[in-house]
Curated annotation (Swiss-Prot):
Compartment(s) where it occurs, according to its Swiss-Prot or TrEMBL record: Cytoplasm, Cytosol
Annotated function: May act as an export chaperone for the filament capping protein FliD.
Record's keyword terms, sorted: Bacterial flagellum biogenesis, Chaperone, Cytoplasm
Protein name, UniProt field: Flagellar protein FliT
UniProt-listed GO biological process terms: bacterial-type flagellum organization
Organism encoding this protein: Bacillus velezensis (strain DSM 23117 / BGSC 10A6 / LMG 26770 / FZB42)
Family membership: Belongs to the bacillales FliT family.
GO cellular component: cytosol
Oligomeric and partner information: Homodimer.
Signal peptide range in chain numbering: none
């Protein structure tokens, strides 16, 4: 068995275990980045022909890759929602302390009397 295929399988399995049900954090993001860089190196070292066992491992890696992509998407959406929430909080905070700074045009009317 090609040791590169087996090590790729183990790394992918470890990464999926780390991502599953993990809260978003800077450490997690840096570990995902490190994993993708390491994985690129591993994929460059994998050359055919493959045995049946290697083919099944690569199929499992492909399946786990789809799951990892979903988890990364979930984390990305969570970060995006946090950024939106923080922007809203900042706007509400500024409006509370300086209510006349940003006036809106709704509620205005024009008096036709001269």
């Amino acid at each position: 068995m090609n040791s590169n295929v087996f090590s790729l399988y183990n790394e992918t399995k470890n990464m999926y275990a780390a991502l599953k049900d993990a809260p978003e954090s800077d450490d997690l993001i840096s570990s995902v980045t490190a994993f993708t860089e390491k994985r690129e190196e591993m994929l460059a070292g994998i050359k055919p022909p493959f045995s049946e066992e290697e083919k099944t491992l690569l199929q499992q890696v492909a399946a786990m890759d789809r799951l990892i992509t979903g988890e990364v998407k979930r984390i990305q959406d969570g970060i995006r929602n946090e950024i939106k929430t923080l922007k809203k909080k900042r706007i509400y905070h500024n409006t509370y302390f300086n209510p006349y700074h940003q006036t809106t045009s709704d509620g205005r009317y024009y008096d036709k009397r001269k």
